[in-house]
Amino acid sequence: MAKKVTGYIKLQIPAAKATPAPPVGPALGQHGVNIVQFTKEFNARTANQEGMIIPVVITVYADRSFSFITKTPPAAVLLKKACNLKSGSAAPNKTKVATIKKSEVQKIAELKMPDLNAANVETAISMISGTARSMGITVVED
């Protein structure tokens, strides 16, 4: 018989930098999860993605054990990294902060494909392009 699920915890944590300090510790502590064990496992699993923010969904079971799934980094983080930006535009409709080639957007879309609700790569490209526009990044043809 499967374990009884008591809750889900969704967090965005920098890769290989999970610590028992807030926000990770309190979120896990209130569900009775072994915080040190989670941080060690998360840091080991995300060691190759240094510098990225990794969304994680933690499933907590009745016996206080847990399992977790790491997702791909948010599209905004990938776009900022591709354009070497600290943050997007405060007024994206007025101030453009960068340009990105459609081929780079396609690479990001292919990377994000498992986590996107998109039927094909073209749809994923349009979703990532929309995120770029809302950040003040102009998408240009190759």
Swiss-Prot record:
GO molecular function, one term: structural constituent of ribosome
Database matches in Gene3D superfamilies: Ribosomal protein L11, C-terminal domain, Ribosomal protein L11/L12, N-terminal domain
A GO BP entry: translation
InterPro entries registered for this protein in UniProt: Ribosomal_uL11, Ribosomal_uL11_bac-typ, Ribosomal_uL11_C, Ribosomal_uL11_C_sf, Ribosomal_uL11_N, Ribosomal_uL11_N_sf
One Pfam family linked to the record: Ribosomal_L11_N
This protein's record includes keyword RNA-binding: yes
GO cellular component assignments: cytosolic large ribosomal subunit
CDD domains the UniProt entry points to: Ribosomal_L11
SUPFAM superfamilies according to UniProt: Ribosomal L11/L12e N-terminal domain (SSF54747), Ribosomal protein L11, C-terminal domain (SSF46906)
Highest taxon in the source lineage: Bacteria
Coiled-coil residues: none
PTM entry text: One or more lysine residues are methylated.
Key words of the record: Methylation, Ribonucleoprotein, Ribosomal protein, RNA-binding, rRNA-binding
Family to which this protein belongs: Belongs to the universal ribosomal protein uL11 family.
Subunit composition and interactions: Part of the ribosomal stalk of the 50S ribosomal subunit. Interacts with L10 and the large rRNA to form the base of the stalk. L10 forms an elongated spine to which L12 dimers bind in a sequential fashion forming a multimeric L10(L12)X complex.
Family annotation (PANTHER family): 60S RIBOSOMAL PROTEIN L12, LARGE RIBOSOMAL SUBUNIT PROTEIN UL11M
Function summary: Forms part of the ribosomal stalk which helps the ribosome interact with GTP-bound translation factors.
Name of this protein: Large ribosomal subunit protein uL11
